[in-house]
């Protein structure tokens, strides 16, 4: 799924698909689904995001996927283009984009299986 979200007042083209968790694991040496589960648990228990890093990583990868040639190779370079708390403030939109993408994948799977 492709789309655009706003981070720090800037329109950022994003792409999320089945390869996103694979890119996440290869680049950050961490399991994407486990990281997202931890974030969801923290949000449920405390209402806060305690660790911003998985969100920064996800946002970077989804911004990198549609245009890898014009996206900085280092996440630090990409993040430097935004104000300090902008990823945190955009995290609901980042999650919403990922969830929409994941929902579309589940929808397609149901249609293929005839359910």
For every predicted segment, state its role.
Residues 1-11, 30-47, 65-115:
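Charged interaction scaffolds used for protein-protein
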Residues 15-17:
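Short linear motifs in exposed loops
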Residues 19-22, 26:
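Short histidine
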């Amino acid at each position: 799924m492709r789309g655009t979200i706003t981070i720090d007042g800037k329109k950022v083209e994003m792409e999320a698909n089945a390869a996103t968790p694979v890119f996440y694991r290869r680049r950050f040496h961490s399991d994407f689904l486990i990281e997202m589960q931890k974030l969801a648990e923290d949000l449920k228990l405390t209402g806060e995001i305690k660790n911003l890093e998985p969100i920064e990583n996800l946002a970077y990868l989804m911004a990198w996927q549609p245009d890898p040639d014009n996206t900085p190779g280092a996440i630090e370079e990409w993040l430097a283009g935004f104000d300090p708390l902008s990823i945190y403030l955009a995290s609901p939109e980042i999650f919403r984009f990922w969830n929409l993408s994941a929902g579309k994948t589940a929808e397609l799977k149901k249609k293929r299986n005839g359910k």
